[in-house]
Amino acid sequence: MYKRQYETSGNNPQYGKYFFSPGIDYHNPVAMLEQRDDEGIRKEFSGSVNASLRIIDGLKISAMGAIIERSERYGHYYGRYYPVNIGNNGTAETYNDHYKNKMLEATIDYSGTFGDHKLQAIAGYSFSEESSESYDQMNYKFDTDIFGFHNIGNGGALKEGLASMGSSKEDNRLIAFFGRVMYNYKEKYLFSASVRYEGSSRFGDNHKWGTFPAVSLGWRISVSYTHLR
């Protein structure tokens, strides 16, 4: 559905050039665009490096490192004649955010077959660190719309204690040592055991580290009774 463009009467220009009338539900979409200013920029970088080395047949060491970094900055301004802003004399908002994530993992794994026996094992270390910061501000009651959100401190709401602002910061770190062994006999009987020793800044003060073991047994019935077919 499209809305028509309305030109205001030259005898009553007080509500802005294109509005038919303020405070009602039919406003010119062109005017709404002119009464609103949105700007933003987002920068993001991500990169990773992988390396592996085969020491002997069946034995390999690997390492992986990665980083993700992102920054965002946004600004919005709603003019005094914008439909939802009438009476506020302009509203300005700004938002800034920065995020960073660093990861590292190193492993050594082995795989070998001895007759009817097959063995696989892996051990490793992993590290992950995240950090984020954000800031936001909002102010209104401006004397003019000329400066938009670039003059956010001059809104009258700040002087009256009605403006708002906020900020946040969070850092998280995760470190883990892990290992896993898998064994099967004739692809029929299966065994697996794993353990992970993990420390996290998100854990409680008295429990920064935890051990997480797991064991499983299996039997492939289809393999056991294949000869009966």
Where are these regions (language model features)?
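Short beta-strand segments enriched in hydrophobic/aromatic residues
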Residues: 53-55, 67, 112, 127, ...
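Transmembrane beta-strand segments that form the barrel wall of outer-membrane beta-barrel proteins
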Residues: 191-203
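Short glycine/threonine-rich loop-to-helix capping motif typified by GTGT followed
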Residues: 205-209
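Transmembrane beta-barrel architecture of outer membranes
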Residues: 176, 210-212
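Residues on the lipid-exposed face of transmembrane beta-strands in outer-membrane beta-barrel proteins
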Residues: 47-53, 106-110, 123, 179-183, ...
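Exposed, low-structure sequence patches enriched in small/polar residues
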Residues: 174, 180-182, 194
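Outer-envelope beta-barrel architecture signal
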Residues: 57-61, 115-121, 187-189, 211
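Surface-exposed loop/interface segments of Gram-negative outer-membrane beta-barrel transport/assembly proteins
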Residues: 3-44, 64-175, 223-228
